[in-house]
Amino acid sequence: MLQQRTLKSLTHAVGVGLHSGQRVEITLRPAPPDTGIVFRRVDLPQVVEIAVSATAVSDTTMASTIASGNVKVHTVEHLMSACAGLSVDNLYVDITAEEVPILDGSAASFVFLLQSAGIVMQNAPRRFVRLTQTVEVREGSGATEKWARLAPYHGYQLSFEIDFDHPAVDATGQRVVFDMSSGSYAKDIARARTFGFTKDVEMMRAKGLALGGGLDNAIVMDDYKILNAEGLRYDDEFVKHKILDAMGDLYLLGKPLLANYSARRSGHALNNLLLRELLRRTDAWEVVTFEDAERAPRGFAQLAPAW
């Protein structure tokens, strides 16, 4: 049987929020089968729990935010991406502020935390959402068109194409394909950092965004070049970060997908719109388990390898 997974022990990290600039502590704790991933605002007089789901997403401005009533947790996508990449199903995330820490701007630190705590099997079947028909959302037209699509696939494959019209980005790979059956999330995707442009920083900070951003947790570019002295971690780091974000956004569904995801110029908003369209299209998917692990897609039966 393909089983659900959680952590063997708890693990802890301290950092700042990318957009809020606030100091924040997170503690990742094991959770029972069928719990899902639950964020807990432990800084409030009464702890508020927010279970991840596509409909819990309340805002997608520059990040994915989940909410329960007026209580929110911002920028959950990098931690969610690490959970997706390492196939962690059940987890409590205790958090002391309203934004997940950005750490180094990628999912690598979250991968390290999860693997350091240890990932263990649980005595419950892992439930997948398997696509049976194609679901697609689009916005805009012509050169400004954005789209994202989920199609039937025996496994989990993601392909993404970017178009930023910037010399530093244009000099790198514009499209990447990642397949869970043949690639290593920790090695191939997790280290890709978020990125931004100096010309946007003043505007973002006027809106209360990017207050914790800098060269130590993002790739920063002026009009012509990358400002980080160390350069890129991957030749195609920009588009790989979009894959990283998409994996996190899609894992907010609450169950792992068996599908081919493909997108052009998509972001947090369109990814969530795609999930909501998927939920609306009840004819386009089914929930499946694998009693025989041999029948499961490659890449899901074993625990994810370390670095």
Swiss-Prot record:
Necessary cofactors: Zn(2+)
User: Is Hydrolase tagged as a keyword?
Assistant: yes
Enzyme Commission (EC) number = 3.5.1.108
Q: Pathway involvement?
A: Glycolipid biosynthesis; lipid IV(A) biosynthesis; lipid IV(A) from (3R)-3-hydroxytetradecanoyl-[acyl-carrier-protein] and UDP-N-acetyl-alpha-D-glucosamine: step 2/6
**Reaction catalysed?**
a UDP-3-O-[(3R)-3-hydroxyacyl]-N-acetyl-alpha-D-glucosamine + H2O = a UDP-3-O-[(3R)-3-hydroxyacyl]-alpha-D-glucosamine + acetate
TM regions (residue ranges): none
Print the keywords alphabetically. Hydrolase, Lipid A biosynthesis, Lipid biosynthesis, Lipid metabolism, Metal-binding, Zinc
Query: Which residues make up the binding site for Zn(2+)?
Result: H78, H241, D245
* Enzyme active site: H268
Molecular function GO terms recorded? metal ion binding; UDP-3-O-acyl-N-acetylglucosamine deacetylase activity
The coiled-coil regions, if any, are none
Q: Which GO biological-process labels does this protein carry?
A: lipid A biosynthetic process
Q: Which InterPro entries match?
A: Ribosomal_Su5_D2-typ_SF, UDP-acyl_GlcNac_deAcase, UDP-acyl_GlcNac_deAcase_C, UDP-acyl_N-AcGlcN_deAcase_N
Q: Which cysteines are joined by disulfide bonds?
A: none
This protein's GO CC annotations:
membrane
Q: List the HAMAP family.
A: LpxC
Question: What does the function comment of this entry state?
Answer: Catalyzes the hydrolysis of UDP-3-O-myristoyl-N-acetylglucosamine to form UDP-3-O-myristoylglucosamine and acetate, the committed step in lipid A biosynthesis.
In the record, the note on similarity to other proteins reads: Belongs to the LpxC family.
Protein name, per record: UDP-3-O-acyl-N-acetylglucosamine deacetylase
Q: Which organism is it from?
A: Albidiferax ferrireducens (strain ATCC BAA-621 / DSM 15236 / T118) (Rhodoferax ferrireducens)
